[in-house]
Swiss-Prot record:
Lineage: Eukaryota, Metazoa, Chordata, Craniata, Vertebrata
The protein's name: E3 ubiquitin-protein ligase ubr3
Species the sequence originates in: Danio rerio
PROSITE patterns in the cross-refs: ZF_RING_2, ZF_UBR
Enzyme Commission code: 2.3.2.27
Record-linked PANTHER family: E3 UBIQUITIN-PROTEIN LIGASE UBR3 (PTHR21497:SF39), UBIQUITIN LIGASE E3 ALPHA-RELATED (PTHR21497)
Zinc finger residue ranges, UBR-type: 80-151
Pathway in which the depicted protein is active: Protein modification; protein ubiquitination
Enzyme class: transferase
Annotated spans, Disordered: 302-330, 970-995, 1128-1152
The keyword Acyltransferase belongs to this UniProt entry's keyword annotation: no
Length: 1863
């Protein structure tokens, strides 16, 4: 009842009243009232209504306003942490210098307020969300705190008054339980309801949760209250059950209980089925229990019977596999259903159930700065961990959910204290490992490796969603995160049962993703599961391994290593048993995944390297070693097979696997441990056994015979060579790689860096990426640590970013120093690290280029031999590989085969053989000091070599060898021939016969048999009898292919060579000289000189080493060299061999021919490119240069680039220039000042567009149109500053009819990108420059030569009259058809048709708004204005391109490519259509003093524009264009003179306005005094005086702004400064006239100094013929008046005076125009990109107020636009495109804020230009992925600006695409 009355009163007073009640000591009535009120307000059945929230706010505030309350609470904030929580895509910072945990991150504010100068930091876009760690000493060093969190704020904050938060403590528990009840009620199991129901519930709750979030942001005081409520178990008990009478609450509670039921890892029913096995004592029962707990498939029954069988099999596997490990799940409670004791736990529970809604996550995280809360929350999180992962596996949105989970867990587990705490108290490690196992068990399948039928091993199935979508990563990343803490990792390593569990987890990945080689047809479906497999091994196995390894660095941790190694071996043994492995790997199977082997290898390596363990103590017996060796060796052989195209039928993915295996992110967790493991095996097993295993695995055993022919049962002959090369290369890598065998970390880093740099020059970031770093972030080899930088500067030189003339931009690159090539280039390391085989070639090419350049060696060098770092003593056994007979026999055989030119040998084979010999010579075995004598009879090859030392075996001569050859082999035939020659049997002395007999017994050699024998020997060391019973030679029988090969027969070959003699003979063969090594050679050899070179050098180096190390060898060598005999040619070459040799030779010759042709072609192409392509270079082909001066009066000939004919342009078949028309606003963006405008980066800065050239001209025109006659206005100014049409050409010409057919062919060709043929676009057929129109060339002579140039002697007045007459003849066009507007009956020639069509193109180039400035659009006046403005635009732009003046003379590139001459004629022809009414012809007003016309003004509604207001260059262009062509030069000069006087007068007027009143008076007096002197019309003083006195008549022209002007011109005007001002004012007009004269008459433009420009131009234009002294040129001296100057000036002034009705300041502003403009510039950008980024990436869009997803900036005007934003779309066109049309007439240059790159929009196309911001290493950072600080690269920005001004975007940038208005 009372509640109702309370509800009726206003909220404020109620709240105040209740608060007063509750403050009393006896507050029971207050409590009761509050409870009742809350019952009715917060009744959850009413749903969420805003009213309830409102009540809560008032109640919390207890009578104050809520905002006020917030402020008060904030003032008590005692938090020392920032704790700002952000969501995905937020921009945060990470500083590695300050971080203790690798996950440390800072918000932008804390980062910018801290001092991180010189630190290793980067900016990043958050993937999953995060929180700011500023102030948290567990995660980062205090030095990095920002100045706000550096002070321990807690100490000086007053304690909170009790009553402030009293109401909060009362109200909030009820508020929270309301939310919880709502969540309970809304929840339905996802199976039954659609996900969107959950979304709906969340939407309705949104305001409530937002309110909670708001509260958390109030600071420490409020957080404490919330923590208390959330963790208080008593309140939870009271409120959670629901009161008995409340049905709604009860119903909820039941829903909640049912939801809880399914929260265990295993649901209740399954548990029932397992029958409480958890309590069972017997091992089996416990196993079954654990099995059911682990959610195995035991209880799952499937309908499908076939599935069921499969399942049964699996279940058996599962049980047998897991009985061992089940008992170690210590605490079954991990798996049980959850029980909740406080609000926090239930809130988290619902957060999980609803799949982590963002708001809830943020609320829970916002509370973390509260320490008590942090601990409780972490425990709660761990308690729910299993449940979270279970939910994740079922979720449909696993990606978003993963991100949210990691968002939370990374905040909790990065803190070592917390992690240790929950590991100890809540068994975090057990939970994680168990959950991981549980996860993976959902996707196990039977392994098919080795014994497919009886294999008992299970592996994960990489095709399952769990692996394919990386669903496991949140779990694994948490696991890696906690293992990075030493205390946690030690616990893990000490807990043996956990380790065992972990090993069984790792074994799920052992042998996954098995490949079977396809032998018959190509595989139908290429599965891409391999990437999931590699990712899984790297993330789930390798990274935790690296994490553990970082804690095994010191002697004290030896035991950990021993334990891990022991368990690895046990698990491996179990694995071998499970897959049924005996001793031979099964054929044609390959898996790249052996994580158990790799764990074993890495812990071995660590133990030996860091913990001083003895290797032998960690190794198993020989038999186990042999087993361990098999699979890694299989991978190495298969790599070779894949590169030999033997797996080609398995599709591309198998190549992908081979590449991923060695790729930089994987190699140190995959190939490196594999090779290390093989090195360990090789150092401990019998070397003969190991070597023969290698050749057998590589399938090249059959090739290793002395016979010239053989049969290989397993390889095609074209695969033999690559496989042999592979086997030898592998042996070389095995013997020479030292990564785990004794190199220090620095040496490894250096070697890695050198090998990457040798392949290619690299950017800093790609180098960081390519150097395999220890994947665990805490490992200390942090990329970018100082040692990386030091190392880099040690081995490489930095090449600054440069530009190529084509405009493609280079990044800053590092390139190896010369001494690196000389001493450190290691081809073996390069081969090991290359993903693509072509990189090896690239490294060799670069190496040989270096040798050529430094003059060391000019030929084709061989890979250099590199000395190795010494072996760690533990691995000395590896050297025995190089000193075993088997290897020596192989080497001997191969040397012999190469010398005899047997097939399938190659240079690479020889190279590797020599490498092995040299390795052997450099690594002697220590034990045998005495050279062994063959004292013991060995079974098989005692007579090949006496001992095992390579040195002594080198000179051992082998006489006879017995070989098995096919009957067809040449050896057999040779023997038959011999027998035919001597019918008698060989009569030799008996001893030699026995000798031969002896040989026949011995010299047979079978690798396979040898290997079997050794294997047997090792296995049966104990019983001798068994060693006799060698297994039957299964290999031979098993490998025989079907079909009947020719019979094998045994033959004896006579050899009589030793390895030394073979080397000498090979030397002779390579050098093609008979006695290439003289006796004296040995004496003078110096091995150091032989470091670089080809095969000869290598052989010489080896021989030198051999003779230096053994006297015996030296003697033998001298004998051999002494005997020097011609190399024994192979006796008879069988025709087959001959053919193959010829073939080789022919191929070689063909290759040489091809090289020659290619070189010739390249040089031709280069010379063409230089002449035709180079856009910038002025030396273009003179042929195409249309404006080149012709000495003769002949017609100009043009070359057509399509049909190749040369001829004049005629009326019927006109020729045209290839041109590109584009609208341009570059001129309109010019400003007065030379300094570019700055880009605003704060709210205070702005850019004002009013002062640009375009804006000024617009204002001027509209001002005129207000007061003067429209048609006259349209002739008084030029338009085209914005959106003017610019015409440029590449200088090539073509027949217009040829062009049309060319366009047709393009139309049918669909492949052209970025060119729309419908719009007339094409590329020039010769130089491929982009173009879109053809400008017809006028028939006739090139330049007006001869008579037209004769200097004129006529007087000025005659010329003026002639010009006037010429203007009268408008209609007469000097072509055969006279064209008049009103005369339609005309024959149009082809030429005029083309001209019309070009005019149409020109009009279509720009937008309508840039053409219609008149009152009535489309009128002839308007058209007339547009046409002459096109000429003006092109002249002005050429001036800009020449640097704004003509000082540089005629050599400018612009002139060469200029088409102004042609353009002028086309425009002139078009303008001839309009006649200027002679009554209004400005010429008369310029040259006659006509007083008669004043009275005519009265009938006009508006006056014409006074002469002084008109734009002089416009008049010039109008006159020239409307007079008949060709114009005599004298007439041109006359027009210029007349207009110059007008320009000069305007200059005086503009100047006089700037004077103060006193100055005006003074100057007018001076002028009056000089007026009567002779030549006064050529002195500016008199003219100025006259002008001032005339203009003073006008009503207040001068009085308008006298105050401001006087302020402006505080400096006094001296005569010099006035003269300078006048010259500057006239210069723009003179420049344009001069340029026009240059194009029309071909006059050259001499260069000069800037100071002399005025005098030079006046001389060129013939204004200053009389005045010769160039020194002090007076501007007035150039005037030539045809009538009295003073009269004319008075008349012009009177026109202004007559404008009585115009307001005076307008007249003044029209008079005071200034024609000078600075060059166009882009905005000035700040040096540091961060300045732009921080201001703009958060700036909101002006139209919708939200922060745009892709903000962009216009670099021309600074506008802030949304790229692709839908908010700013107009008629389907997005904002960037719109802005480009508005600001740049369809050219836009935009900087994309979030990507730091610039895009160019040109019309309907766009392209990515690149970035002008580079990091410290000269690299772009597109999309800010690396987030390193970026700095403005001035050169690049200049290039961008230059391309903009020169309009060359279309030519220089190649990759254009259509934007469909979507940008």
């Amino acid at each position: 009842m009372m509640a109702a009355s309370l509800l009726r009163r206003d909220k404020k007073s109620t709240a105040a009243h209740l608060k007063a009640d509750l403050k009393r000591t006896d507050n029971s009535s207050g409590l009761r009232q509050l409870q009742e009120l809350l019952d009715s307000v917060l009744n959850p059945e009413r749903g969420s209504d805003p009213e309830a929230l409102d009540w809560c706010k008032w109640l919390l505030a207890g009578g104050d306003g809520f905002d006020e309350f917030c402020r008060t609470v904030r003032s008590y904030d005692n938090a020392t942490l920032c704790g700002l929580v952000w969501t995905a895509n937020f921009v945060a910072y990470r500083c590695r210098t300050c971080g203790i945990s690798p996950c440390m991150s800072l918000c932008a504010e804390c980062f910018n307020n801290g001092d991180h100068t010189g630190h290793d930091f980067n900016m990043f876009r958050s993937q999953a969300g995060g929180a700011c760690d500023c102030g948290d000493g567990n995660v980062m060093r205090e030095s990095g705190f920002c100045n706000r969190h550096r002070l321990k704020t807690g100490e000086n904050v007053p304690s909170v008054p009790r009553d402030l938060l009293l109401m909060s403590e009362m109200v909030l528990p009820r508020f929270i339980i309301t939310i919880i009840q709502y969540l309970r009620d809304g929840y339905t199991e996802p199976e039954s309801a659609a996900d969107r129901d959950l979304q709906k519930v969340l939407q309705q709750l949104d305001p409530h949760i937002s309110f909670l979030e708001e509260l958390t942001k109030m600071g420490g005081a409020m957080r404490t209250v919330l923590t208390k409520i959330l963790t208080d178990q008593q309140t939870f008990k009271e409120l959670s059950m629901g009161q008995e009478d409340n049905v709604y609450a009860k119903k909820n509670y039941e829903k909640y209980l049912s939801a809880l039921k399914s929260s265990g890892l295993v649901s209740v029913e399954e548990k029932g089925a397992a029958g409480g096995a958890g309590d069972g004592t017997s091992d089996a029962a416990a196993g079954a229990g654990a099995l059911s707990l682990l959610g195995a498939t035991a209880t799952a029954s499937l309908d499908d019977s076939s599935k069921e069988e499969d399942q049964d099999g699996l279940q058996g596997v599962g049980q047998r596999k897991r009985v061992k490990l089940s008992s170690s799940t210590k605490d079954p409670s991990i798996m049980d259903t959850l029980k909740h004791k406080c609000f926090l736990e239930e809130l988290l529970f619902w957060t999980i159930k609803y799949e982590f809604p963002q708001k809830m996550v943020t609320f829970l995280l916002n509370m973390l700065p509260d320490q008590d809360y942090k601990i409780t929350f972490t425990k709660t999180f761990v308690q729910h961990y299993a449940f979270i992962m279970k939910t994740l596996m079922k979720s449909h949105e696993s990606d978003t959910m993963s991100n949210r989970i990691v968002h939370i867990s990374v905040q909790l587990f990065s803190n070592e204290e917390l992690a240790r705490h929950v590991t100890e108290e809540c068994q975090l490690l057990d939970i994680m490992v168990t959950v991981l196992l549980y996860m993976m068990e959902s996707c196990l399948i039977k392994s098919e490796l080795q014994d497919e039928e009886n294999n008992r091993h299970v592996v994960v199935n990489c095709g399952e969603a769990l692996l394919k979508n990386n669903t496991y990563w949140p779990l694994v990343s948490d696991f890696i995160n906690i293992l990075s803490h030493q205390s946690v990792a030690k616990r893990f390593l000490e807990d043996h049962s956990l380790l065992l569990l972990w090993m069984s987890f790792v074994s799920f990945f052992q042998g996954m993703n098995l490949n079977k080689r396809e032998l018959n047809e190509h595989v139908e479906f290429e599965s891409q599961t391999y990437y999931a497999a590699f990712a899984a091994e790297l993330e789930a196995c390798a990274q935790p391994m690296w994490g553990l390894l970082t804690h095994c660095k010191v002697k004290e941790t030896q035991d950990y290593t021993k334990t891990v190694v022991r368990y690895c071996l046990e698990t491996l043994q179990m694995w071998f048993d499970a897959i049924g492995f005996v001793d031979e790997p099964s054929l044609n199977q390959l898996t790249f995944h052996l994580p158990l082997h790799r764990y074993y290898a890495m812990f071995l390596s660590k133990g030996v390297k860091c913990q001083g363990l003895d290797l032998d103590s960690l190794l198993p017996d020989q038999e186990m070693l042999m087993k361990i060796m098999v699979h890694p060796l299989q991978i190495q052989a298969s790599l070779s097979e894949i590169h030999s195209n033997m797996w080609v039928r398995n599709g591309l993915q198998i190549k992908g696997q081979a590449m991923t295996y060695v790729q930089s992110h994987f190699c140190n967790s995959m190939i490196d441990p594999d090779i290390y493991l093989l090195q360990v095996c090789a150092s401990r097993l019998d070397p003969d056994y190991f070597i023969s295993s290698v050749f057998e695995r590589f399938k090249v055993v059959d090739l290793l015979t002395m016979a010239s022919q053989h049969q290989n049962a397993v390889l095609d002959s074209e695969q033999e060579r690559p496989m042999l090369e592979g086997a030898l290369t592998f042996l070389v890598i095995l013997c020479s790689l030292r990564i785990h065998l004794g190199m220090s970390d620095d040496e490894i880093l250096r070697a890695e860096m050198v090998s990457q740099l040798c392949m290619n020059d690299r950017t800093h970031s790609s180098l960081l990426d390519l150097i395999p770093e220890n994947p665990n972030p805490k490992s200390g080899v942090v990329p970018g640590s100082c040692s990386f930088e030091e190392m880099l500067s040690g081995v490489a030189d930095f090449k600054a970013p440069v530009f190529e003339p084509g405009g493609s931009m280079q990044q800053g690159m590092y390139t190896p120093k010369a001494e690196v090539w000389e001493k450190e280039f290691d081809p073996i390391m390069v081969i090991l690290r290359t993903v693509y085989r072509r990189d090896v070639q690239s490294a060799m090419d670069r190496y040989s280029a270096f040798l050529k350049q430094s003059g060391v060696h000019t030929g084709n060098p061989w890979p250099p031999y590199k000395e190795r770092t010494p072996l760690h003593p533990c691995y000395k056994g590896l050297v025995r590989l190089l000193h075993c007979k088997t290897l020596h026999i192989v080497i001997f055989t191969l040397l012999y085969k190469i010398w005899m030119d047997h097939q399938n040998m190659s240079e690479h084979v020889l190279c590797m053989v020599l490498y092995l010999i040299e390795l052997g010579l450099d690594n002697q075995v220590q034990d045998d000091k005495v050279e062994e004598e063959p004292c013991i009879e060995e079974h098989c090859h005692d007579s090949w070599f006496p001992g095992t030392s390579l040195l002594s075996n080198l000179h051992h001569v082998i006489n006879f060898v017995r070989v098995r050859v096919p009957e067809t082999a040449p050896e057999v035939e040779r023997k038959r021939e011999r027998e035919r020659e001597r019918e008698t049997p060989p009569s030799t002395s008996s001893e030699s016969a026995t000798f031969g007999q002896n040989l026949r017994e011995a010299q047979v050699f079978s690798l396979v048999a040898e290997r079997r024998r050794k294997f047997q020997e090792i296995i049966n060391r104990s019983n001798h009898e068994a060693s006799q019973a060698v297994r039957p030679k299964s290999s031979a029988s098993r490998w025989l292919p079907p079909g009947t090969p020719p019979q094998l027969v045994t033959e004896i070959l006579e050899i009589r060579e030793s390895m030394l003699s073979l080397l000498v003979k090979l030397h002779q063969k390579l050098s093609a000289k008979q006695n290439s090594l003289s006796l004296s050679w040995l004496a003078e050899v110096d091995p150091a000189h032989h470091a670089h070179g080809d095969g000869l050098t290598a052989i010489e180096r080896i021989l030198a080493k051999a003779s230096a190390r053994s006297r015996h060898s030296k003697r033998c060598l001298q004998e051999i060299c002494g005997k020097v005999c011609p190399p024994i040619p192979p006796k008879k070459i069988s025709p087959g061999d001959k053919k193959s040799m010829d073939k080789e030779e022919r191929r070689q010759r063909a290759r040489e021919r091809q090289q020659k042709l290619l070189a010739e072609f390249a040089s031709r192409q280069k010379s063409f490119m230089e002449t035709a392509m180079d856009v910038e270079s002025p030396e273009a082909d003179a042929v195409m240069d249309v404006s080149s001066e012709e000495s003769l009066d002949s017609e100009v000939l043009y070359d057509c680039v399509i049909c190749g004919q040369s001829g004049p342009s005629t009326e019927d078949r006109p020729t045209g220039l290839v041109v590109l028309l584009q609208a341009s606003s570059v001129l309109g963006h010019r400003c007065r000042s030379d300094m570019p405008k700055r880009l605003p980066t704060t709210d205070e800065e702005h850019i004002y567009p009013e002062d640009t050239c375009g804006a000024t001209h617009d204002v001027r025109l509209s001002l005129m149109q207000r007061y003067f006659k429209d048609s006259s206005c349209l002739q008084s100014v030029s338009i085209g500053w914005d959106g003017g049409v610019y015409v440029q050409t590449c200088g090539h010409t073509l027949h217009i009819d040829c062009h049309k057919s060319y366009m047709e062919s393009l139309r049918n060709d669909q492949v052209l990108q970025g060119i729309s043929v419908d719009k007339g676009e094409f590329t020039c057929p010769l130089c491929r420059q982009f173009a879109n129109s053809v400008l017809p060339c006028r028939p006739g002579r090139g330049m007006e030569t001869g008579a037209w140039h004769a200097p004129s002697t006529k007087s000025m007045s005659t010329l003026v009259k002639e010009v006037e007459d010429l203007q009268e003849q408008l209609g007469i066009f000097p072509v055969r058809a006279s064209i008049k507007q009103r005369d339609p009956i005309l024959i149009e020639s082809n030429l005029s048709k083309e001209m019309e069509s070009v005019i149409k193109d020109i009009k279509n180039t720009t937008q309508k708004k840039y053409m219609d400035y008149g009152k009535n659009p489309g009128s002839p006046d308007n058209d007339f204005l547009f046409m002459y403005s096109v000429a003006r635009t092109n002249l002005e732009l050429e001036l800009v391109h020449r640097g704004g003046n003509l000082c540089s003379g005629g050599a400018s590139a612009a002139a060469k490519r200029s088409c102004l001459n042609q353009l002028f004629h086309v425009l002139a022809m078009h303008m001839r259509l309009y006649s200027i009414d002679s009554a209004y012809n400005p010429w008369t007003r310029l040259t006659l003093s006509t007083q008669s016309r004043e009275n005519e003004y009265c009938d006009e509604e508006r006056p014409e524009v006074p002469m002084l207001f008109r734009d002089v260059p416009s008049l010039l262009i109008i006159f020239i264009l409307t007079m008949p062509q060709p114009l005599r030069k004298e007439h041109f000069t006359c027009v210029v003179k007349v207009l110059y006087s007008l320009q000069f007068t305007q200059a005086l007027a503009a100047l006089s306005i700037r004077f103060s009143r006193e100055e005006r008076l003074a100057w007018s007096n001076t002028g009056a005094a000089k007026k009567n002197l002779p030549n006064s019309d050529k002195s500016w003083e008199s003219l100025l005086g006259h002008m001032i006195s005339e203009l003073t008549k006008a009503k207040d022209v001068y009085d308008t702004n006298s105050e401001e002007t006087s302020a402006l011109s505080s400096s006094v005007w001296s005569p010099q400064s006035i003269e300078f001002r006048l010259q500057q004012f006239c210069l723009p007009f003179l420049r344009l006239s001069c340029l026009l004269q240059h194009h029309l008459y071909g006059d050259s433009l001499p260069g000069c100094l800037v100071e002399e420009e005025f005098s030079l131009l006046t001389r060129c234009l013939g204004l200053a013929a009389s005045v010769q002294c160039s020194g002090s040129m007076s501007s007035a001296a150039c005037l030539e008046w045809n009538i009295s100057a003073f009269d004319l000036i008075s008349q012009w002034c009177s026109e202004v005076v007559a404008l009585s009705d115009t307001p005076s300041q307008q007249s003044a502003s029209l008079l005071g125009q200034d024609p000078q403009w600075a060059a166009p510039r882009l905005l000035q950008l700040p040096d540091n990109y961060n300045t732009i980024f921080q201001y703009y990436h958060r700036k909101s869009c002006s139209s919708c107020g939200k922060t745009p997803k892709d903000p962009a900036l216009c670099l021309v005007c600074g506008a802030f636009v949304c790229l692709k934003g839908h908010c700013c779309k107009q008629q389907g066109v997005c904002e960037c495109v719109l802005h480009s049309q508005h600001c740049g007439a369809a050219t836009g240059i935009f900087l994309l804020i979030n990507a730091s790159v610039i895009i160019i929009i040109r019309g309907h196309r766009f392209c990515l230009w690149g970035s002008v911001y580079l990091d410290a290493h000269g690299e772009e950072d597109r999309d800010l992925r690396r987030g390193k600080p970026l700095y403005l690269c001035e050169e690049r920005y200049r290039v961008l600006e230059q391309q903009w001004v020169a309009h060359t975007f279309d030519h220089i940038n190649k990759r254009w695409g259509p934007h469909y208005n979507g940008l």
